[in-house]
Amino acid sequence: MNTFSQVWVFSDTPSRLPELMNGAQALANQINAFVLNDADGAQAIQLGANHVWKLNGKPDDRMIEDYAGVMADTIRQHGADGLVLLPNTRRGKLLAAKLGYRLKAAVSNDASTVSVQDGKATVKHMVYGGLAIGEERIATPYAVLTISSGTFDAAQPDASRTGETHTVEWQAPAVAITRTATQARQSNSVDLDKARLVVSVGRGIGSKDNIALAEQLCKAIGAELACSRPVAENEKWMEHERYVGISNLMLKPELYLAVGISGQIQHMVGANASQTIFAINKDKNAPIFQYADYGIVGDAVKILPALTAALAR
């Protein structure tokens, strides 16, 4: 048997739902989707869900992952085994841990390949900081996986599809985290997964102010802006949602223009599927040039304005 009888999908990020649903279609006979609202439910059905389970009643001061209890109960009530697919977002991983505990299921994070052999999930993902690929065969009846962006192509919606909708009511967990305040985060996030052209900056750009040079290039060629993990996580120059690498975005654009990025394996795992890689780096020995189809050795701060002017003609 090379499919599960049931797969359960949930995404806290709506843009990740189509790829998870495409993966679900390849891995199971029946697709169930947990959703937070009616609009997401309608989308899930168009993407192939046979059953939609609307999570309902969570107090405003509680976290989405506190639905784990009723989600696990619902999963158990509808089969003695099954596969759970979640995005590898921070919330997705928190929810995966809670579901794994409640379902007594193995949890595998950042999966880049998923297959089913003899009714068991086989998962591949990066290990040792991206230096190797590990393969795991999950033996527990339930398997909970967080999926790296780009692992599956996005499913295409079909408005003619039909499915059944159910409601799952909130049940307060015995131990819960209560949200005491929220702070809006300014973000210009885009769906980088769908971008044809990507300009990505690393710490070699020099400063946060210099990112404006990359933004001007993006405007000139119609590209989207991304970054390396240190730019987002260490320097805080850009949003977390824009960093490319093993634990976040896995992109497949037509062009990936890496500016001031050294090219460590942890980053290149997220960019190496690009059709063409163009690198700008002042270090001629930077690892990025081992991956690049084209490269310029030089100061990005000087090269970017000239490149922008040439391409804007």
Swiss-Prot record:
Record-annotated disulphide pairs: none
Entry keyword Transport: yes
An annotated GO BP: carnitine metabolic process
Pathways involved: Amine and polyamine metabolism; carnitine metabolism
InterPro entries, A to Z: DHS-like_NAD/FAD-binding_dom, ETF_a/b_N, ETF_a/FixB, ETF_asu_C, ETF_asu_C_CS, FixB, Rossmann-like_a/b/a_fold
UniProt keyword list: Electron transport, FAD, Flavoprotein, Transport
Binding site for FAD: 255-283
Top-level taxon in the UniProt lineage: Bacteria
Keyword Flavoprotein: yes
SUPFAM superfamilies: Adenine nucleotide alpha hydrolases-like, DHS-like NAD/FAD-binding domain
An example molecular function term from Gene Ontology annotations: flavin adenine dinucleotide binding
Pfam family, one: ETF_alpha
Annotated function: Required for anaerobic carnitine reduction. May bring reductant to CaiA.
PANTHER family listed in its UniProt record: ELECTRON TRANSFER FLAVOPROTEIN ALPHA, PROTEIN FIXB-RELATED
Family: Belongs to the ETF alpha-subunit/FixB family.
Subunit note: Heterodimer of FixA and FixB.
Protein name: Protein FixB
Organism: Escherichia coli O17:K52:H18 (strain UMN026 / ExPEC)
